């Protein structure tokens, strides 16, 4: 019973050695090493600023920065926040003034409309 197990272990070891030797041969080629370095440098390179403001499909896929910002809508810049307006001591009096101004402005417009309608009605009666 010990012999089949030893045979399996030896076959596994030989296959591991064979696979590791293949991967070492592939990694040792100078072309693949330079290609890997180039890919890694592109991966860790910061995104270049692109000032194109067009949102068409072609411009959205122009570069990685445009795709993230325009295509996906992801923006890592700090959001501008509005400063809170200074509140006055008498907020109720300020709101009363604005309401009274609104009421004053609306009333004359209604009167003008009524007078225009009355003139039009009298003109139609005379023409017939």
Curated annotation (Swiss-Prot):
Segments carrying motif Nuclear localization signal, and RNA-binding (TAR): 78-82
Keyword Secreted: no
Function in brief: Transcriptional activator that increases RNA Pol II processivity, thereby increasing the level of full-length viral transcripts. Recognizes a hairpin structure at the 5'-LTR of the nascent viral mRNAs referred to as the transactivation responsive RNA element (TAR) and recruits the cyclin T1-CDK9 complex (P-TEFb complex) that will in turn hyperphosphorylate the RNA polymerase II to allow efficient elongation. The CDK9 component of P-TEFb and other Tat-activated kinases hyperphosphorylate the C-terminus of RNA Pol II that becomes stabilized and much more processive. Extracellular circulating Tat can be endocytosed by surrounding uninfected cells via the binding to several surface receptors. Endosomal low pH allows Tat to cross the endosome membrane to enter the cytosol and eventually further translocate into the nucleus, thereby inducing severe cell dysfunctions ranging from cell activation to cell death. Through.
Primary localization: host cell
Protein's UniProt keywords contain Transcription regulation: yes
Source species: Simian immunodeficiency virus (isolate PBj14/BCL-3)
Comp. bias (Acidic residues): 25-34
Protein name per UniProt: Protein Tat
Subunit structure, interactors included: Interacts with host CCNT1. Associates with the P-TEFb complex composed at least of Tat, P-TEFb (CDK9 and CCNT1), TAR RNA, RNA Pol II. Interacts with CCNT2; the resulting complex is unable to bind to TAR RNA.
